[in-house]
């Protein structure tokens, strides 16, 4: 049996090794994990860019984001722009103009297994969630992600509406049934206004994941088309157009940009030029931009287009 002196010596050697490897002794700080989290926040590059871009088809919505990614000289080498590309507009535009391999165009649609419907709406919803979570995991591992563009957000609204009717309320068996909301066939109508909260909750799961990306220093852009909010066969009032997304979305996005195209004609009613513009309808990070309109592109008959883009998306203006 070892003597006490040997035991003490051995204990001293153990304590020396413990001190050298830096083993932490338990402490009574109940907020230790929060302090560590706060420390990690100081190393995150914050952009605070979360913008909604809306307008009619062909007004340059996706183009201004792709151009910003291409022109931003401050971005980290090998940075990636991910696109959740519902209408494949980002993929086609990148292929035709930029051909940038660091633009990743994700197809969010999951094909249906039956002949009756082309898409599996519940599977598509889950696939979108998985793509966003994957991007978050890449950022957390240190992969440089410049931004995420969700293109064709009106399709996401449709997916959430159909899943509410198919999965949550059991009013339809597939996407075709879900599209028939007349209540005339087997598919029933949504009976209570409160039921629409289910659709909205589904929709804003994407909001939650987008905010998580913004907190990690990633720019997030939502792009959608327009819809008429007062159409009536009996009413001659001017049509009121609004972005095609869940109606509370305007409250959740810090920046809103409306894209327009204005045509100019000559005395013979022939098209002379088209001016494409971006107008800020909301900007919490730079209120001086609100109601400002900036020219993005001008096309003139018989001439090459003049492209200006929207440098605000990468030069620090926002």
Per-region residue spans from a language model:
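A generic local structural motif
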Residues: 37-40, 60-63, 207-208, 243-244
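Residue-level signature of catalytic and energy-coupling elements of molecular machines
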Residues: 83, 151, 253
């Amino acid at each position: 049996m070892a003597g006490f002196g040997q035991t003490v010596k051995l204990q001293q050697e153990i304590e020396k090794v413990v001190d050298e490897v830096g083993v932490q002794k338990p402490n009574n700080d109940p907020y230790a994990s929060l302090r560590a989290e706060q420390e990690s926040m100081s190393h995150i590059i914050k952009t605070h860019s979360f913008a909604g871009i809306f307008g009619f088809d062909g007004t340059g919505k996706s183009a201004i984001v792709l151009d910003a990614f291409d022109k931003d000289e401050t971005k980290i080498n090998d940075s990636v722009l991910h696109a959740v590309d519902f209408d494949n507009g980002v993929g086609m535009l990148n292929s035709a103009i930029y051909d940038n391999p660091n633009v990743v165009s994700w197809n969010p649609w999951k094909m249906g297994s039956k002949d009756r419907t082309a898409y599996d709406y519940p599977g598509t919803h889950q696939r979108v969630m998985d793509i966003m979570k994957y991007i978050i995991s890449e950022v957390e591992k240190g992969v440089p992600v410049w931004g995420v563009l969700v293109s064709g957000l009106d399709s996401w609204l449709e997916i959430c509406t159909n899943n509410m009717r198919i999965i949550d309320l059991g009013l339809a068996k597939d996407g075709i049934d879900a599209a028939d909301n007349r209540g005339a066939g087997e598919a029933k109508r949504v009976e209570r206004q409160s039921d629409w909260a289910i659709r909205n909750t589904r929709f804003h799961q994407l909001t939650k994941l987008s905010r998580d990306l913004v907190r990690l220093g990633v720019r997030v852009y939502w792009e959608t088309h327009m819809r008429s909010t007062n159409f009536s066969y009996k009413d001659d009032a001017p049509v009121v157009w609004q972005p095609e997304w869940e109606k509370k979305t305007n409250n959740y996005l810090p920046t809103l940009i409306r894209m327009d195209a204005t045509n100019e004609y000559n005395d013979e009613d022939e098209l002379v030029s088209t001016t494409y513009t971006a107008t800020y309808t909301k900007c919490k990070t730079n209120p001086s931009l609100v109601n400002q309109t900036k020219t993005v592109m001008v096309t003139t008959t018989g001439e090459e287009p003049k492209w200006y883009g929207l440098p605000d998306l990468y030069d620090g203006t926002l």
